[in-house]
Amino acid sequence: MKVVKAAAVQISPVLYSREATVEKVVKKIHELGQLGVQFATFPETVVPYYPYFSAVQTGIELLSGTEHLRLLDQAVTVPSPATDAIGEAARKAGMVVSIGVNERDGGTLYNTQLLFDADGTLIQRRRKITPTHFERMIWGQGDGSGLRAVDSKVGRIGQLACFEHNNPLARYALIADGEQIHSAMYPGSAFGEGFAQRMEINIRQHALESGAFVVNATAWLDADQQAQIIKDTGCGIGPISGGCFTTIVAPDGMLMAEPLRSGEGEVIVDLDFTLIDRRKMLMDSAGHYNRPELLSLMIDRTATAHVHERAAHPVSGAEQGPEDLRTPAA
């Protein structure tokens, strides 16, 4: 049975620099490749960084200030030199890489998850379908085209970001599509220990229901970085310690390694796919333990288009001259 060496990566972005953060990610992919890692998950929108500032700034402050503008400037276009660099690093390491970026498409930002196969090919670009609370001031909404599991060199991979793990239908879409490895991403630092505890519930429950491995990555900010990007604007809210929970969960919902709760590093675990079969013999949520004739999910995986073109058809008589359109005399 197949065994895949997987890594959940806890890493700090280089604030306000897309290029420096990408360089750091590329270096980490190389290091993991030297350790024989075949699959790696990086944190939510780690390139260039998660918009932590939006948790404490009002809409007016975001519009008149510089934080949102800087993020727009440093965001990632897909494809671009930034994505090319990550793909090339994945190719050189022979590694499947799942990573979160702030994607810029025109004048709109999206919380986007990218998946690169071991040959460096970008095989999935999905956007968070519903940004959470204050995130809606920053990101647009994604569509259903990315709510699917994708075949890769290491198996079928599904991706969700942060509070999407509280959407049971989104999770079931991936379960029913046969994901074997679930790549979960959260922002981590600055949201408190309660955030980490709820995250643990989310990812362990998803592993239990899906019968898949969950490789979960959170980002780390040190105290100086938190003070730099999260400024108390008078609402009495500032940085909160805690919020990281980088780990890997087995298909039966049990933790396979002690989670990283602070600092940079990675959790590396060998994923024995026999464990998937053992779990699904007991409970296959999209198979023998389901009743699709009673309960089923409808999903629209159509990619959203802002313009829909229709072919022009001549109106009856439009090709006739004025003389031809006269009403015949009685």
UniProtKB/Swiss-Prot annotation:
Domain CN hydrolase residue range list: 4-273
UniProt entry tagged with the keyword Cell division: no
Catalytic activity: a nitrile + 2 H2O = a carboxylate + NH4(+)
Record region (Disordered): 310-330
Enzyme Commission identifier(s): 3.5.5.1
Function in brief: Nitrilases catalyze the mild hydrolytic conversion of organonitriles directly to the corresponding carboxylic acids.
Protein name: Nitrilase 3
The species this protein was found in: Unknown prokaryotic organism
